[in-house]
């Protein structure tokens, strides 16, 4: 094997040796022919005064390229190689054959130079009329609005197909005339909402009204109230008719109105309890002591305190004691002589609203409470309860001195006064 292959070359490569532009470097640049020129000559004297860094800068390349292309007879207009087309002769970094010193000098010139912009052609907006520009802006805004409401529209469309609440509410709203939307259309997307955010719930109000409507066959309907199952049955004489049970949901203000007596409630539960207690005749909670019935379990618990002997509520004016706080509050109206409830027929005033309603039955002759045994009717429920004790023989009031029982409390008081001399 020759020794020339074993000995490393002592001659350094040309690209490892630093090159400094000598006095003849600019002369060689002047004599370099430019391929884009028509005469194929060298660089002119005016261009020779420009430094090499400036001739290689991006600004010089971007500005001089169209000039040289326009002066060239060999230029191919309309083709890809056309310098005046979109594919202009942009500046590119030097090749790796340049020395490291020249690369450093070029990079320094690029860092010092200002950032350049690509020569994009400006869009001719002046070619469009004012109406065309407005049409473009409006179409863009409509597309943005459709993108924002895409999820809501998708929910409404799926609700119309699968029977979701949105489609069901929309169809009932369209059928009831509350809104102009079709079944499955979303009222929130159309922006038809009332002040205060009530429109969002007002759209669904007709559907909620069906919760309180009872058909004529509501005799076997099962009611739920605080864990108690209330079964309405015609066999026990419960009055359940649609004209008494039908209620209406008002759209304004979120109030619930009974169409039988026009009483307004703030919650649907309050309206349901009112209909069951006042109009349906369903009073399933009965007292074991006196047989009095109540429409609510809480009312029965409060009533049981009447049969006990404990009187924990005392009047500070006269010293009279009561078993219930509500009875004491009613008693205090006697001392203040406050009678806020007048009769609409004779003008007589009462302390309690219930006393005023009982009094009005005298003028109207109405007797809504009827005995199930003999058919006798009474204007007050208390009179019906006292009358029913004649059929059952129940005597809840007993004398503590002789043990004699009575059906009415007034009879016990009279017995104590006449027989025992007590007041």
UniProtKB/Swiss-Prot annotation:
The modification Phosphoserine is found at residues 20, 57. This is Zinc finger protein Gfi-1. Residues 141-258 are annotated as: Required for interaction with RELA. Transcription repressor essential for hematopoiesis. Functions in a cell-context and development-specific manner. Binds to 5'-TAAATCAC[AT]GCA-3' in the promoter region of a large number of genes. Component of several complexes, including the EHMT2-GFI1-HDAC1, AJUBA-GFI1-HDAC1 and RCOR-GFI-KDM1A-HDAC complexes, that suppress, via histone deacetylase (HDAC) recruitment, a number of genes implicated in multilineage blood cell development. Regulates neutrophil differentiation, promotes proliferation of lymphoid cells, and is required for granulocyte development. GO terms for biological process: cell fate commitment; cell fate specification; cellular response to lipopolysaccharide; DNA damage response; inner ear auditory receptor cell differentiation; inner ear morphogenesis; mechanosensory behavior; negative regulation of cell fate specification. Interacts with U2AF1L4. Component of RCOR-GFI-KDM1A-HDAC complexes. Interacts directly with RCOR1, KDM1A and HDAC2. Also interacts with HDAC1. regions. Interacts (via the zinc-finger domain) with ARIH2; the interaction prevents GFI1 ubiquitination and proteasomal degradation. Interacts with PIAS3; the interaction relieves the inhibitory effect of PIAS3 on STAT3-mediated transcriptional activity. Forms a complex with EHMT2 and HDAC1 to promote 'Lys-9' dimethylation of H3 (H3K9Me2) and repress expression of target genes. Interacts directly with EHMT2. Disulfide bonds: none annotated. Residues 1-102 are annotated as: Disordered. Coiled coil: none annotated. Restricted to lymphoid tissues and testes in adult animals. A zinc finger (C2H2-type) spans 256-279, 285-307, 313-335, 341-363, 369-391, 397-420.
């Amino acid at each position: 094997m020759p020794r020339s292959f074993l000995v490393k070359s002592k001659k350094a490569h040309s690209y490892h040796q630093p090159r400094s532009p000598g006095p003849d470097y600019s002369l060689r640049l002047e004599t370099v022919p430019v391929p884009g020129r028509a005469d194929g000559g060298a660089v002119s004297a005016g261009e020779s005064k420009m430094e090499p860094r400036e001739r290689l800068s991006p600004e010089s390349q971007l500005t001089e390229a169209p000039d040289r292309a326009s002066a060239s007879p060999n230029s191919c207009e309309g083709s890809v190689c056309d310098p005046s087309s979109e594919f202009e002769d942009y500046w590119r970094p030097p090749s790796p054959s340049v020395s490291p010193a020249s690369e450093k000098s070029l990079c320094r010139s690029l860092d010092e130079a200002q950032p350049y912009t690509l020569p994009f052609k400006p869009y001719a907006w002046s070619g469009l009329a004012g109406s065309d520009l407005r049409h473009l802006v409006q179409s863009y805004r409509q597309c943005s609005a459709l993108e924002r409401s895409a999820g809501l529209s998708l929910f409404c469309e799926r609700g119309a197909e699968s029977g979701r609440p949105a489609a069901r509410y929309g169809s009932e709203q369209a059928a009831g005339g509350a809104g102009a939307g079709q079944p499955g259309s979303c009222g929130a997307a159309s922006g038809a909402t009332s002040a205060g955010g009530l429109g969002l719930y007002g759209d669904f109000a007709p559907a909620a009204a069906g919760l309180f409507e009872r058909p004529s066959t509501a005799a076997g309907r099962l009611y739920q109230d605080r864990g108690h199952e209330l079964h309405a049955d015609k066999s026990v004489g419960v009055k359940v008719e649609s004209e008494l049970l039908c209620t209406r949901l008002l759209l304004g203000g979120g109030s619930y109105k009974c169409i039988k007596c026009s009483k307004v409630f703030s919650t649907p539960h309050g309206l349901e309890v009112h209909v069951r207690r006042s109009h349906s005749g369903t009073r399933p909670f009965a007292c074991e002591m006196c047989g009095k019935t109540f429409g609510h379990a809480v009312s029965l618990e409060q009533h049981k305190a009447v049969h006990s002997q404990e009187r924990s509520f005392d009047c500070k004016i006269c010293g009279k004691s009561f078993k219930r706080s509500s009875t004491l509050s009613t008693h205090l109206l006697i001392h203040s002589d406050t009678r806020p409830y007048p009769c609409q027929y004779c003008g007589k005033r009462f302390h309690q609203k219930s006393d005023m309603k009982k009094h009005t039955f005298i003028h109207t002759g109405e007797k809504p409470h009827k005995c199930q045994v003999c058919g006798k009717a009474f204007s007050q429920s208390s009179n019906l309860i006292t009358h029913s004790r004649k059929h059952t023989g129940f005597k809840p009031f007993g004398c503590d001195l002789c043990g004699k029982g009575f059906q009415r409390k007034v009879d016990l008081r009279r017995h104590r006064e006449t027989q025992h001399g007590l007041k």
